[in-house]
Amino acid sequence: MLSLIVEATLLLVVLVLSAHYVRRRMKSLPPGPIGIPILGNMLDMPTHDEAQTIAGWSKKYGDMIFVTIAGTPFLYLNGAKETMDLLDKRSALYSECDMGGLVPLTGYGDRFKLERRLMNQALSARAVEKWEPLVAEETNMMLKRILDAPERFIPHLRRMAGSLIFTSIYGYRVTSDDDPYVKAAEEFMSVSSHAILNGWLVDFLPFLRHVPGLTIHKKAAEWKIKMEEWVEKPHAMFKATLADNPDDNSFCRTLLFPEDGHPIDAETEERIKWVATSMYGAGSDTTVASLSQFILAMILHPEVQKKAQNEVDAVVGRDRLPTLDDRARLPYVECVLKECLRWGTPVPLTIPHRLSQVDEYNGHILPEGTLCVANIWAMLHDERIYPEPHRFYPERYEGKMDAEQTRLLDPSTYIFGFGRRRCPGIHFANPSVWLGMVSLLSTFTFTPSLDKKGREIIPPAKFISGTFRHPEPFKCRITPRHEGVPALIEQVQPAF
């Protein structure tokens, strides 16, 4: 009797799986691993190095990979062409995302459009020019801190990025490594990816909302409290100190007090608060990840470091620090920046774009509600675009190319996202990272740390999985490039 039950159960499982397989193929869904009833592909999903693992699936399934997680359809886009065809050219269909209050997670509607308009108004290429002196000052102060305590280079990068963002958003200068607003914001960002994941899990399995005592509910309550603190406290501080900063040209002052003199309504002010919060989340971690990846790359590739430093010396000299005005005359440094962004990929995956209606592409049916995730890491390590993708090789960007080739090869085409959800902060983030990188090249040399016997300890090129791809903690030696560096850095005076 027992054997009959077992056999019947196995037969039922086979029938269910077969029906699931046939149903998928009849609907011409894109290929992907076959899941199991109810859970779908939940057990197939990687718990770490998600972008790299899913990129590897392309060898079997191609550049469009379809999976379901507890009934929710996902489409992973590993190829640049497929991503641009769908998320850029058909952005009207692929712009939904309603997973939280931050701008990148807001549903595509009137609120999102207002918030994006506010961000574009403050972050256009022309608008961010007013912050170039601030970028220079914070970069130079970062150099001074590294000179004084080189072993704390990561905290120095974090303070520089935090102060740069907080000053440009709120007109608030960060004066210590223990600044309460920066610490609160970093704490929030450290848990945000986990909180978002918990939110997705409830979306996949709605019945979990009604199961008491789950850790998810406790975490959701903590997320809500931290979200409100992060949004409300900096804004309240900004308004309380308005009278003390009459010359402040920050993002919040510009938007709260328009030049036309017309007061804004309460709804617009509420949106400004959320936009300000989103700008910190998007800008600070990206800057720290990019610059720490750069330092790691220079340690691992001393020949690249030396070649870039020689170019800086030839153009800038050794009697001053680089400025943004030098950028056009430093083509190899530009190549190093691009290769760092490609090799390190500070943002490996995009936030999901929800498909608002059924679509068809290359003979495949894409169901309404599908969450489309662009695998930026896969695109930036695609050997069809970047031969020898795992080699750190800045020279790949040299030589004559037409406009389309240049666009496809430039990592910024991918790093800042796609379609109507492309990050508008590119005009602020890119110059900030470039100036930080070239200033470090100008003043310091980065080499491996030494063990007790004086042997070099080469750090591995390993990265922490998460929304932002930071290198695993590593040690190194940071030494002034020449005897004039200390005096050069010390002579820098705050401009504000």
From Swiss-Prot:
One of its GO terms (molecular function) is monooxygenase activity. Its cofactor is heme. The keyword Translocase does not apply. The chain crosses the membrane at residues 2-22. Heme binds at residue 423. The keyword Translocase does not apply. It comes from the Eukaryota. Keywords: Heme, Iron, Membrane, Metal-binding, Monooxygenase, Oxidoreductase, Transmembrane, Transmembrane helix. Its main location: membrane. InterPro entries: Cyt_P450, Cyt_P450_CS, Cyt_P450_E_grp-I, Cyt_P450_sf, Cytochrome_P450_fung. Its EC number is 1.-.-.-. It catalyses: wigandol + 4 reduced [NADPH--hemoprotein reductase] + 4 O2 = arnebinol A + 4 oxidized [NADPH--hemoprotein reductase] + 6 H2O + 4 H(+); arnebinol A + reduced [NADPH--hemoprotein reductase] + O2 = clavilactone A + oxidized [NADPH--hemoprotein reductase] + H2O + H(+); (2E)-geranylhydroquinone + reduced [NADPH--hemoprotein reductase] + O2 = isoalliodorol + oxidized [NADPH--hemoprotein reductase] + H2O + H(+). Pathway: Secondary metabolite biosynthesis; terpenoid biosynthesis. It is found in: Membrane. Cytochrome P450 monooxygenase; part of the gene cluster that mediates the biosynthesis of clavilactone A, a meroterpenoid that features a unique benzo-fused ten-membered carbocyclic ring unit with an alpha,beta-epoxy-gamma-lactone moiety, forming an intriguing 10/5/3 tricyclic nested skeleton. ClaR, ClaS and ClaT are sufficient to produce clavilactone A. Within the pathway, claT acts as a multifunctional cytochrome P450 monooxygenase that catalyzes a ten-electron oxidation to accomplish the biosynthesis of the 10/5/3 tricyclic nested skeleton in clavilactones. PANTHER family: P450, PUTATIVE (EUROFUNG)-RELATED, P450, PUTATIVE (EUROFUNG)-RELATED-RELATED. Belongs to the cytochrome P450 family. This is Cytochrome P450 monooxygenase claT. It comes from Ampulloclitocybe clavipes (Club foot). The gene is claT.
